[in-house]
Amino acid sequence: MNKHERLDEIAKLVNKKGTIRTNEIVEGLNVSDMTVRRDLIELENKGILTKIHGGARSNSTFQYKEISHKEKHTRQIAEKRFIAKKAASLIEDGDTLFFGPGTTVELLAEEVNHHTLTIITNCLPVYKILLEKQTAHFRVYLIGGEMRHITEAFVGEMANAMLEKLRFSKMFFSSNAVNKGAVMTSTLDEAYTQQLALSNSIEKYLLIDHTKVGKEDFTSFCQLNELTAVVMDYEDEEKVETIKTYIEVVD
């Protein structure tokens, strides 16, 4: 096994397991401890993993740093636009909708061109997009409260008190990570607000691109099998099939 093959194998192992110990690599690949340590440093420099005491953890499995709203606008835009167009086809005139925070939902807001809708959101960028379309029959409401600047979403007691009184025919929301059937986000505040909206919605649609599948985040706020369907891209068929073991994926 040459160096390139060895680095590739170590990357596959750490991404599959999430974390791996140095001695596991030594025994599995039959190489020296010093060789493994050099390989881990090289893979860390490439951004594939992070060295930890006695081993390494995958950078693709756990989202240790919450990505800012600005950064999200530069990632998987083509996939997100594909998802948004597909999600828009699920909306019908007369619906009362809840739109959660996230760049994919913002793109959905751009796609909406229905005549008669009521849309409630706790996300400022989503609200600004929809407000441009407001008419006597196309009504848009922003739920207030404490704003999280990294996502520009309103959460907390005030937002939750308003949500408790509302009911929706459909909810469209996104997530930072989906793993083993759990849908995850970065904070307890956003998790609880999303849970409230979900509990008050008849149909529930999760919008995610393929990069979110297999990742983990701080807390889960629902399970895939509690939803109506998932709307996602087909860039990674294996990940689509993984989601299909829990819930329908919209064609």
Curated annotation (Swiss-Prot):
Presence of the UniProt keyword DNA-binding in the record: yes
Alphabetically ordered keywords of this record: DNA-binding, Lactose metabolism, Repressor, Transcription, Transcription regulation
Binding region for DNA: 20-39
SUPFAM superfamilies in alphabetical order: NagB/RpiA/CoA transferase-like (SSF100950), Winged helix' DNA-binding domain (SSF46785)
Pfam families in UniProt: DeoRC, HTH_DeoR
Keyword check for NADP: no
Domain HTH deoR-type: 3-58
PROSITE patterns hit by this protein: HTH_DEOR_1 (PS00894), HTH_DEOR_2 (PS51000)
GO biological process: lactose metabolic process; regulation of DNA-templated transcription
An example molecular function term from Gene Ontology annotations: cis-regulatory region sequence-specific DNA binding
InterPro entries tied to this protein: Carb_Metab_HTH_regulators, DeoR-like_C, DeoR_HTH, NagB/RpiA_transferase-like, Tscrpt_reg_HTH_DeoR_CS, WH-like_DNA-bd_sf, WH_DNA-bd_sf
Function: Repressor of the lactose catabolism operon. Galactose-6-phosphate is the inducer.
This protein's name: Lactose phosphotransferase system repressor
Native source organism of the sequence: Staphylococcus aureus (strain NCTC 8325 / PS 47)
